[in-house]
Amino acid sequence: MANQHFFKPLLPGFHTHLRIPVAFFLKNIEGRYEQKTAELRSDASKITWEVKIDGQRLTDGWKEFALSHDLRIGDIVVFRQERDMSFHVTMLGPSCCEIQYGSCSDEERNLEKKKNPNGEAKSSSLDPSCFSANVAPSSLRYDLMLFPMGFVRENGVVGSGKIVLMNEKGRSWNFNLRQKPSCGTVYVRGGWVSFCDANGLQAGDIYTFKLIKRGGTLVLRLLPKGAESCSLDPSCFVANVAPSTLRYDTLYLPKRFMRENGVDKRRGEMILMNEKGKSWTLDLKLKKSCGTSLIRRGWRSFCSANGLRAGSIITFKLIKKSGTLVLCLLSNEPEEEVCSEANEVESLSTDQESHEESSHNEKISRRKEKKGRMIWKASSSPSENRFVTLNLTPYNILRSALRLPIPFTRMNGINEETKMTLLDKHGMKWLTTLRLVDYKRKRLGMVGGWKGFIQANGVKANESIMLELIWEEETSCVLKFCSKVKLAIK
């Protein structure tokens, strides 16, 4: 038993849990031990860590072990089973050399990272180590800066420890990382106003940071102006639904976006439209003091009706400039989060019409959610939880995206690290990507490859299909097309 071992490369999101390979779990763990915890130890510490085992996953206690050993994306961990549920863990760097822990371990690991010529080659906002945001008035008022969820998740940033913000000239400011328990948002507070003043950043300005040091104290470098441009069409912008935007029923519009589209002086009304064509009319205001545009009276209703919560990342596209401006809500895909603009807001009230409209849409949303649950239950008995029935809407086809039922993904151990392929009735495979589309409920969605898959199977909008889950490897699975399904839901 002492020679049994397995290894795992660490991927984005590894702090939440670690999945034990299926083959190792079936051969060495399942049915052998009644205990629900494992003991982990390493040569770096005399501490023995107790970690909860939930099925094939290491959960409670794993995050503390990972943080204590400064594990990062790209590292490899090797588990050697010593006895029963006791494991010795060896940590390897991306070069597959064992990580040496000591007084200078941070410097040694930093040198190892710098040996990779591609480590800091990219400077655009498409680089996962970068993020762009705008200086919201409330961020100056409350002296804090929020980190986009996508950036935090991709780089394994946690809400504790130290972080240094460095400007282009090398001058640095020290901060303590914090995290909001309610929503998991990571932020820094105290000193943000000083940083902005020293670097000429004003309300409405867009800035871009690049993570240049991960080991020990994190270091973010402010990139030159102009580096914040992302791959989005100039008629688009990405926004973060900050808690204050909902509290004050207001959303600030990026100065750069308004200026590039020649609408930075406009006032009056603005229409927000969702993917289904339903519209909301909001007030468009211009702050003369700073030249910042904002929309108010109806923003909260729009978010409520479209299932947007605090921390959601959304993309708008300006589809009409003449007359009343129209912003269309686009599909919210995680790859665009790296250029998210963390908009926060000032106080303004909601009108009665928006509130009534919100209540009406919430009722419709609840009816649809209940209907969706009925569809899932029809095909998810304990003996066949590998099957799932999905109803296709016009939006799913248009955006080539589809959400998966939460019970289905949880029962089958599907997560963001899972590689998924779609298999049509002709035996052809279609690649798709699993993305987290609802951060609070941990709901996953399939993005890409979906449109071609349904066309190959002759499926049209508003039809339902049954798929079968087939695991190929530990983290690789296939959703196989079984048949079309007629659902009679009353």
UniProtKB/Swiss-Prot annotation:
Primary location: nucleus
Intrachain disulfide bonds: none
Entry annotated with the keyword Transcription: yes
Biased composition (Basic and acidic residues): 352-364
Keyword Protein biosynthesis: no
DNA-binding region: 3-95, 130-226, 236-333, 387-484
Entry GO terms, CC: nucleus
InterPro entries assigned to the protein according to its UniProt record, in alphabetical order: B3_DNA-bd, DNA-bd_pseudobarrel_sf, REM_fam
Alphabetical list of PROSITE patterns matching this protein: B3
Keyword list, A-Z: DNA-binding, Nucleus, Repeat, Transcription, Transcription regulation
Subcellular location as annotated: Nucleus
Molecular functions per Gene Ontology: DNA binding
Annotated segments matching region Disordered: 343-367
Pfam families assigned: B3
Protein name: B3 domain-containing protein REM14
Organism, scientific name: Arabidopsis thaliana (Mouse-ear cress)
